[in-house]
Amino acid sequence: MKLLHSLRRLALAPLFWLPLASPAQTPSPTQPEAVFAGVPQETVAGDDPAFALFDQRFYDNQLFLLGEAHGVQRPQELDFALLKHLNQRAGVRTYVAEVDCAKAYYLNEYLRTGDESTLDLVFRSWLAETSQWANQDFRAKLQRIRAWNLTLPATRKVRFVGLDQLQDLPLAADYLAALLRKNSPPHPLRPQLDSVLTMLRQPTASPALAGLARRALAQPHVSAASADLRHLLRNLTYPLGSMRQREQNIFANLAALYQDRQLTNEKLYGMWGLAHVLQSPLVDGYPSFAARIQQSRLPLRNRVASVLCVFSGCQMLCATAGLPAPWQAPGQPYSSTDKFNHDGPLVVLEGLAELKQRTAPGSTTLFRLNAPAAASTRQPIRLRYAPGMPPSQQMQFSPRVPAAAYVQYLLLVRDSGPVRPLPAAATGAVGRR
């Protein structure tokens, strides 16, 4: 079920109901596809794309979000290209990542030292869970970021800030131990922190862990502890479970770190699963991460730019166990599938056929939805799902909200291959949530 929720969030499509569903219907000639009329476009190619469609209004934002579908290869290249571009044009050096605070710490250690065993720590829980994140292309991108970082002056070097809820409790234990070595906490707080460390290292998560973290945070001496230590303790108190709760936890982390890390004057960028970057609520009214920012009182409000990847003809790497039998690669932990594109068979984004007519096979094309003459400033996003798909697994955009109020740019990715899975021996010990 966790994989199902993940793919609903990231790919706008479910898995398990396929045997009961027929393909999503293609648009009929009588159905207008005006949502993308008048939308300017730019081909994105090469190692250093110009991104000429980005105007000064775009660069004036503080937070830049790229929405992708995990398991597709080309977004990894786009992420690196966009990070480099924003570093050069907007001074972005803080990558707000879809990882937790512990993984962000070890990512920064890798950027500092280049030690591949440190990178192994980051990937071990993803590999143990047969996660789409455990792939060679993501790891290669991190290696490229480090090599590029070495060429930058200190004032422009990239660092990671993890906004997600805790993903790997043993790694959180290692992180806590590193924090305690770096900055000794107030003496009265040490016994409780030692107990937290012991619980984090247990084979199964203890239900008492959250309460212990709350008691540590309530200690009068905790204000003298490092901000990183307090942030880790806060994360241990968060309830885990549903995707809705996760969105709330991610936003809570941003709000806390925005103050603790003094990010008011920092430009921020990150690549996230595509549903996280939607700036308006869906029909059910529940706000995603970006929508929560827009509804908040943070100085970031109304200073967010979302760029959303949509896919045609692409292959996605998925855990084999989560796929219907006809899609599975027998005997393999991962399988590649082309069923999660946005022009069918499971979901159809109305207007995508028009955009495909304006682009070439194998291309990547940027479209500006908030251009003054674009119909997407007035017309909503419309998705059609295959018959038989449970409503609970559908993402329904509000018909009263224009497309540009959800995202300001689209990146149409055509005919990308899947990411390549890491071999099982690529990392060491197994992580645990």
Range-by-range predicted roles:
Residues 14-23:
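Hydrophobic h-region of N-terminal signal peptides that target proteins for export
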Residues 13-14, 33:
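Generic intrinsically disordered, low-complexity segments enriched for polar/acidic and small residues
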Residues 24-433:
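Compositional signal for N-terminal targeting/processing segments
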Residues 2-11:
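Bacterial N-terminal signal peptides that target proteins for export
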